[in-house]
């Protein structure tokens, strides 16, 4: 009987230590993700470049018609990414994973007709790229989102 009780106590101690280590490791990862996530939050990111399979698509904010200069923006709060397409406002839930992975769910947007089309990027493509984003980084004050096109080409969106 003593051996059974001793065995149960030892098992409980091992399980407790293992779960405490797991909780501690998870807390460290959450703190790291929270710190990295803070780089995203509180800033209105404006799209300045789009690269598909490493090739510059020549999208430039400064050459857009003045009527649509405020387009293709990105704002992160704790749980929702939102912004302006061209011309529609959009939002979507998102999650940040380990190693700067990101998952942006289905984008929902208003349904206004566009009077002016941005050069070299359609709103539909922008929403597709946002929705297909899989990783991110902030480098030299610029946000880079890595994504895929509808036909699975690599996309890099650069925001300032």
Question: Model-derived features: where do they sit?
Answer:
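Sec-dependent N-terminal signal peptides
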Residues: 4-13
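Lipid interaction determinants
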Residues: 17-160
